[in-house]
Curated annotation (Swiss-Prot), chain B:
The lineage of its organism: Eukaryota, Metazoa, Chordata, Craniata, Vertebrata. It holds the Pfam family MRAP. Two paralogs of MRAP2 are present in zebrafish: mrap2a, which plays a role during larval development and mrap2b, which constitutes the ortholog of mammalian MRAP2. GO terms for molecular function: corticotropin hormone receptor binding; signaling receptor regulator activity; type 1 melanocortin receptor binding; type 3 melanocortin receptor binding; type 4 melanocortin receptor binding; type 5 melanocortin receptor binding. It comes from Danio rerio. Disulfide bonds: none annotated. Interacts with mc4r. The gene is mrap2a. Its main location: membrane. GO terms for biological process: developmental growth; energy homeostasis; energy reserve metabolic process; negative regulation of adenylate cyclase-activating G protein-coupled receptor signaling pathway; protein localization to cell surface; protein localization to plasma membrane; regulation of adenylate cyclase-activating G protein-coupled receptor signaling pathway; regulation of growth. PANTHER family: MELANOCORTIN-2 RECEPTOR ACCESSORY PROTEIN 2. It comes from the Eukaryota. It is a single-pass membrane protein. Belongs to the MRAP family. The chain crosses the membrane at residues 42-62. This is Melanocortin-2 receptor accessory protein 2A.
Length: 304, 217
């Protein structure tokens, strides 16, 4: 970018790119890493959580862990570069940059697919409750997870390799909108069934008034789930769309100047995910309590 | 894109080429002159649209909560539920004495017997379950009435436990805490919609293959 070539009048009306300090990324990445590692450890340790639903939640946590790890690594390397210890144009650094970008890409795709898998799994468990264990055997779950990993790995590598092509951006945008639509449909249908049953219970004599409060709570949970998904992924998808459609429009330029903020939102999705999916489970929370108690008792034994 | 100019005198090739690269910014700088609307209008429009979408979705879901009309056949399923609760009552009393062991074997035995009790109740029901099966299974009647009954029982079992959360002792709920299954969220204080977003409800694996084969065959 050659600032001297710009006309003076355009400088102060330009939408300068909003820079987010690297420390913010680092803090978010470290928080996400610790949360998701906790989820993975809890799911592995507790035998009760070796079921299809928790496999998908653990898979989401693994993708989030890898993405936050690579984001943290990228920021550390940027700090080194700012300190002058790294050459930003060297071949080794470019290769590392490509590898980290493809890992990030793979993890973003993987989180979308994992969220979809969790929604489909919940849907099957509600609407085909009695056939659930025939439909979702552990073998099928492992096959699904393997497919997701292979698909995301190759897509991530291809997307970073051919990022200039418009196909990559179109693929990402289409994937986001499809996932959003599917999640909306599945969860709203599940919600409608739950309302139907709650109304039938409420119509019985002796029903309590907590029925309405629980309905509001369900609506709130669903809104948070879908709202967080859209708020974290839509800005980035719109950014890709705008890059393709209007690269020279000043309004679009102002939107594109907020790129780093949109990436912050993407990374913060990895922080919020455990709170929405994993930590809502009572069994997982009990596992944490047991882990804390056992480690506390071990420390006490060493002290005494 | 490189741009080069040939010198005017072509008779003497003195190679007066001028190379320069053109950046898009130099050629067509994004002009911010004369913008009609605010420069961040796309950003503002996007976030306002997103907020409107989320709030609209919340209001729609809340309205669905409030305006759920009572089911016209409310009396009949109530009786059926009372009959089915008798199954759970009998077994619950039996198991209260055992206490809350948390062992898988006795729990599976009891869930098997509970399931058989429900299936027997359903079979005794006869043809009355047609409308209810249709309502509960949402039009999957093509599969067959008995299958619909089985699925209806599954859903009614879900309802049962929803109900029992408020009324029964925790011992009955522990009945459904079958290890290696997705644990039921229903013994927590979450709302019944969180049923969707917590763990799936009662899945009785050992009992089901035998029972469904018995019903479907």
């Amino acid at each position: 970018m050659n600032p001297s070539a710009e006309s003076p009048s355009s400088i102060h009306t330009d939408c300068a790119e909003v820079q987010v300090p690297g420390q913010v990324f680092l803090v978010i990445a470290v928080a996400s890493l610790s949360e998701n590692l906790l989820v993975i450890v809890a799911v592995i340790k507790n035998k009760n959580l070796h079921s299809p639903m928790y496999c998908f939640i653990c898979n989401l946590a693994v993708f989030n862990t890898i993405s936050s790890f690579s984001k943290a690594l990228e920021n550390i390397l940027l700090l080194f570069k700012d300190a002058g210890r790294l050459n930003s144009r060297g071949p080794f650094e470019l290769k590392i940059d490509d590898i980290m970008d493809s890992l990030l890409c793979m993890c973003f795709l993987g989180s979308i697919f994992s969220i979809l898998a969790i929604a489909v799994d919940r849907y099957i468990s509600i609407f085909h409750a009695l056939r659930y264990h025939m439909l979702m055997t552990m073998r099928r779950v492992l096959i699904i997870l393997f497919t997701i990993w292979v698909l995301c790995g190759t897509s991530g590598a291809l997307m970073v390799g051919f990022f200039e092509a418009a196909t990559v951006k179109i693929f990402f945008i289409v994937l986001f909108f499809t996932a959003l639509l599917l999640i909306l449909l599945l969860y709203v249908h599940m919600f409608l069934l739950a309302r139907h049953h709650a109304n039938r219970i409420a119509s019985m004599p002796g029903a309590q008034a907590q029925h309405r409060k629980s309905g509001l709570r369900g609506a709130l949970t669903l809104t948070i789930l879908i709202g967080v998904f859209v708020a974290c992924w839509a800005p980035f998808s719109l950014h890709l769309l705008i890059m393709m459609i209007c690269p020279e429009n000043p309004y679009c330029e102002c939107y594109r100047s907020l790129f780093q903020l949109h990436v912050v939102l993407l990374v913060s999705h990895a922080v919020i995910d455990p709170a929405i999916y994993a930590f809502r489970s009572v069994e997982l929370r009990n596992t944490y309590k047991k882990m804390l108690l056992s480690s506390a008792s071990r420390i006490c034994k060493r002290c005494a | 894109m490189p741009r080069f100019q040939l010198s005017n005198s072509t008779s003497v090739p003195n190679h007066n080429y001028e190379w320069s690269y053109e950046y898009y910014d130099d050629e067509e700088p994004v002009s911010f002159e004369g913008l009609k609307a605010h420069r961040y209008s796309i950003v503002i429009g996007f976030w306002v649209g997103l907020a409107v979408f989320v709030i609209f979705m919340f209001f729609v879901l809340t309205l669905l909560t409030k305006t759920g009309a009572p089911h016209p056949e409310a009396a009949e399923p109530y009786e059926k539920r009372m009959r089915l609760t008798s199954c759970a009552d009998g077994l619950g009393r039996q198991r209260e004495t055992d206490g809350r062991t948390g062992l898988s074997r006795p729990l599976l035995e009891e869930s098997r017997s509970l399931f058989h009790c429900y299936i027997n109740e359903e079979e005794r029901e006869g043809g009355r379950a047609a409308t209810d099966a249709g309502a509960l299974t949402h039009g999957r009647s093509g599969i067959g009435n008995s299958r619909g009954q089985v699925e209806e029982v599954g859903l009614v079992v879900q309802n049962m436990v929803l109900e029992s959360r408020a009324e029964r002792e925790a011992a009955l709920l522990a009945h459904f805490n079958i290890p290696n299954f997705v644990n039921s969220e229903l013994n927590s204080a979450l709302g019944d919609e969180d049923l969707l977003l917590g763990d799936p409800p009662i899945i009785m694996e050992e009992a089901r293959p035998r029972c469904t084969h018995h019903i479907i065959d």
